[in-house]
Amino acid sequence: MKQTVYIASPESQQIHVWNLNHEGALTLTQVVDVPGQVQPMVVSPDKRYLYVGVRPEFRVLAYRIAPDDGALTFAAESALPGSPTHISTDHQGQFVFVGSYNAGNVSVTRLEDGLPVGVVDVVEGLDGCHSANISPDNRTLWVPALKQDRICLFTVSDDGHLVAQDPAEVTTVEGAGPRHMVFHPNEQYAYCVNELNSSVDVWELKDPHGNIECVQTLDMMPENFSDTRWAADIHITPDGRHLYACDRTASLITVFSVSEDGSVLSKEGFQPTETQPRGFNVDHSGKYLIAAGQKSHHISVYEIVGEEGLLHEKGRYAVGQGPMWVVVNAH
């Protein structure tokens, strides 16, 4: 398995393309100059394209991925109804979902043969919309509205329209600020990092019809932490055993172990990391974690070790200015 790591640096308007080897070392293979401030990125389900959101001219760009070395070639673009904060796709590669924090909306862009061809639906009134996350069964779109302390739930129709479910939302505690999410591989649990109180909620998916319950909330910060809480990103290993979340004020990654059924998180430790880590990701082998420092302009690679999933630094690399997004593609 070959793996390519993509790093989006909006301040220098670049994507750095790296080869990740089996020992956790990175080799720079390409630097792509992007026509705009590049932020969120996602790889298409068939691994043929990288979709990126850019500003200040709000667009989704599609880059063709070379199957041998992961190099990028521009392929297409499509306008968006708001500044892109988060980007994702459905599991069949039919639609791109874009959440916009500033516009307070989520949009659906249709794909034809992997290329974006236009927006087919927009839902407004999602104050502080920070991500759009398709459920494992490809039926439900989870959309955290950070400023409203709620996660809105939509059914995705065959033509890409979003239909509010019943119930149409679940709520967090007041002032939590739900932001980014991941799903357990067993498809029974979801985990949401809350930006404003730096906590992680565990949501049980009781059935595919919106019957969802928060079964655990964990503070992700050290006991003596008294500064402003400012959580950012969350990721889980492919085997579902280890979960990670980061806080930008403390510049640390919190390490959680996950119970076998996915229902319980246990805090295992903290890893100091790059300054203001807004984005990170876990590789497809579950052996390495790559974190980007928005203020350090570097990335660090960590090996995931032991039953606790603690992080051991393997290497550090300069990237573009203000790196914000990390994506790993296996090919």
Swiss-Prot record:
Gene Ontology MF: a single term: 6-phosphogluconolactonase activity
UniProt pathway: Carbohydrate degradation; pentose phosphate pathway; D-ribulose 5-phosphate from D-glucose 6-phosphate (oxidative stage): step 2/3
EC numbers: 3.1.1.31
InterPro entries named in the record: 6-phosphogluconolactonase_YbhE, Cycloisomerase_2, Lactonase_7-beta_prop, N2O_reductase_N, WD40/YVTN_repeat-like_dom_sf
Coiled coil: none
Gene Ontology biological-process annotations: glucose metabolic process; pentose-phosphate shunt, oxidative branch
Catalytic activity: 6-phospho-D-glucono-1,5-lactone + H2O = 6-phospho-D-gluconate + H(+)
Domain of life from the UniProt record: Bacteria
A Pfam family hit: Lactonase
Modified sites of kind N6-acetyllysine: 287
Keywords: Acetylation, Carbohydrate metabolism, Glucose metabolism, Hydrolase
Gene3D superfamilies xref list: YVTN repeat-like/Quinoprotein amine dehydrogenase
GO cellular component: a single term: cytosol
Entries under NCBIfam families matching the protein: PRK11028.1 (NF008258)
Function: Catalyzes the hydrolysis of 6-phosphogluconolactone to 6-phosphogluconate.
Family per similarity comment: Belongs to the cycloisomerase 2 family.
Name used for this protein in its record: 6-phosphogluconolactonase
